[in-house]
Amino acid sequence: MNQPQVQQYDIVVIGGGIIGSSVAYHVLARDPAARVCVVEPDPSYEFASALRSSGGCRVQFTCPENIAMSLYSLDVIKNFENTMAANGRPAPVDWVQGGYLFLVPPERVAMLERNVARQQAMGCQVDLLTPAELKARFPSIHVDDLGAGAHTPQDGWCDPNGLLWGFRRKAVELGAVYLKDRVVAADVTPARARRVTLESGAQLDAEAFVNAAGAWSGQVAELFGMHLPVVPMRRFEHYFTCGNPIEPLPYVKDLSRLAFRSEGRGFSGGLVNGDESRGFNFDVDHDYFENVVWPAVAHRFPPLEAAKCHRTWSGLYEQNELDGNPVIGAWNARLKNLYTVAGFSGHGMMHAPAAGRGIAELLVHGAFQSLDLSKLGYERVQASQPYREEGIL
C-alpha cells in the first residue's frame, strides 16, 4: 500500500479566508523565502463570515489593542487598491468613508465619555454629541431616549470580497500555495505540532501551524488537543429600502445590537441576537426583519417606518464565548509552534490586516513588533480571565 506523500512547508495556515490570507501575505512580505501553504476547503467562500458581513471598519473600541488594530487596518484599507495590486491588477475594495455613530441611553453616558476619551488619546477623531447635537447633525433621528452619541467621521465600510481576494492574490503572487482541502487530523509531540493530515489523504509537515479557521477554529483546535472557546453563532443581514426622504446616515450602532448603514439606494444591517443558539446554522428567518429589525430602525429613525426588506441572508460570527475578543498568539504552555488567530466575534474583517501582521511578526521575528497584542493571547483563555470591551458590540 502506498504511503501518502508528505509535503514540507515552513508554515501551514489552516483557513484561507480573510484572516488566513492576511497572515500569508504578511509573512511573505517579511520573509519572501518562507514556504507558506494555506489550506482552504471552499475557495468559493460561500459560507465565509467576512463575505456575509456588512464590511464595517471603525475605531470605536475600548481595549487599546482593538483601537490600534483599527487604526492600522483603516490605513491599509484606504490604500488597499494600489498597495495590494497583484500582477498589475488593482485590488479595489470600494471604500466608503461614511463614518460610524454609536448611541447610548442616559445611564450609559459616563461609559461613552470614558470610551471617547481613550479613543481621542490614541489619536482617533471622535465627536461626543449631546441629544441636541445629534438632532442637529442627523435631523431624522429620534433622541428622546438617548443620552449621547459618538461620531467617528473617518470610519466607514468596504467590500469584504475585494479585501479577501486582494490579500489572497497578493499572497499567491509572493509565493503562497493554496490547497483546496480540509485538515482532518494533527500529529503532535508533547511540545510541538508536527504534521497535519488532509481530507484528501495528503500530509503536511511544517515548522509552524496557524489556526485561522474562523467559525470552524474551535473544531480545528480540538484536532491539536487544544480547547478554544470559539463557536459559530448565526446572525442575519438585511437589505432594505425606504421611500421616505432621509439624510445620509453613517454606520449606526446601539447597545441593543442594532447596526445598519447605507448601501446603494437603501440600507444594509440587522440586529444580532446574542442568545442565538450556537452551531452551524445557515437557515434564514424571513420574518426576522419585520419582527425585530424594523421596529428598532423605525423607532430610532422615524422616516424608516416605511422600510421594506428586499433580501435577508445569514452568516456566522466566530464567537469567543470567553470575552468576545480574538485570540491572537501561540499556545506557549504546550504546542509552542501552534498559533491561533480567531474568535473575532464580528470584528474579523476590520481587524484582518492588523491581526495578520501580528501573527506574521510572531512567526518571522518571534515577537510582536508593530503592536503588542499580548493581552489577546491564549494565556487568558487558559486562566479563564476575560479581557472584554466595555459597552462595545
Q: What are the residue ranges of the model-derived segments?
A:
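Beta1/beta-strand and adjacent pyrophosphate-binding region of the FAD-binding site
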Residues: 5-19, 37
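Core beta-strand elements of the Rossmann-like FAD/NAD(P) dinucleotide-binding domain
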Residues: 6-9, 198-208
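Active-site substrate-recognition segment that forms the wall
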Residues: 25-30, 50, 55-58, 82-99, ...
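Glycine-rich FAD pyrophosphate-binding loop
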Residues: 28-50
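Dinucleotide-binding Rossmann-like beta1-alpha1 core, especially the glycine-rich loop
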Residues: 55-137, 257-259, 278, 297-298
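Flavin (FAD/FMN) cofactor-binding and adjacent substrate-gating region
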Residues: 79, 103-174, 179-180, 185-192
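C-terminal catalytic lobe of FAD-dependent flavoproteins
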Residues: 298-393
